[in-house]
Amino acid sequence: MLFVSAIIDYAGETATHIVEKIKNGDKHLKEKFIKDYIPFILNIVSSFYSSKTGDLKSSDEYSIGLMAFNEAIEKFDVNKSKSFLKFAEMVIKKRMIDYFRKTSSIGRKEIPFSYFNSNNETEFRKKINNLDIEEEFNSYEFICELRDFSKKLESFGLSINNLPDYMPKHKDSREMCINIAKKIVENKSIFDKLKTKKYIQMKELSKIIDVHPKTVERNRAFIICLCILFDNDYGNFKSYLNKIF
């Protein structure tokens, strides 16, 4: 998420235009630009900062964020990216992910789960950090997919950290839920009602699939998770979930 002060008072110029001037040789403007955008950098870095007592500005994370912002200025190409701030956000996040890979004391590619959800002590975090997921975490798209999925779950009052608890233990039950979710997503009326009103229309659903209302209610959370997955192009995340479930 971009910081609210995305446009600073440079006579009405956008960050992208400022960076173009800097790249044309205005080094003094570069120093002022970085200083003015420290709140923007802090906003991104804070998502990765797990300490509750330490000073963020004295942390390694902050230093990495500053270096990444400078790197973004040096590498930005207006012909490839129209928005400098979006490009800078991507570079900072990538560098933070690289940092947590390298500093993991147990050799896993572990990223602080607070980046996706405020609750750290969960079974799902254990499952994620105990798997070898280097290939998936190498993809910035995976991080974006996971974060987006988490936000969509929260809109239903669900948490990504409880995902393993939502899943039925038996394979046949999981397959049944998959079938139900597919039917819901395929039916525009039922699915629109689920997205807007946050409930499943059992009367309408019973017309297209033979399932008991209690079964749907018992597995409501998992069915909603599946509906979100089927409705979105989470290629990396779906591949990763196969390793968990």
Curated annotation (Swiss-Prot):
A motif (Polymerase core binding) lies at residues 60-73. Induction: Up-regulated in the presence of xylan. It holds the Pfam family Sigma70_r2. InterPro entries: RNA_pol_sigma-I, RNA_pol_sigma70_r2, RNA_pol_sigma_r2. The keyword Transcription regulation applies. The keyword Transcription regulation applies. Its main location: cytoplasm. It is found in: Cytoplasm. GO terms for cellular component: cytoplasm. Residues 202-221 bind DNA. GO terms for biological process: DNA-templated transcription initiation. Transmembrane segments: none annotated. HAMAP family: Sigma70_SigI. Belongs to the sigma-70 factor family. SigI subfamily. Interacts with RsgI5. Sigma factors are initiation factors that promote the attachment of RNA polymerase to specific initiation sites and are then released. This sigma factor is involved in regulation of cellulosomal genes via an external polysaccharide-sensing mechanism. This is RNA polymerase sigma factor SigI5. The gene is sigI5.
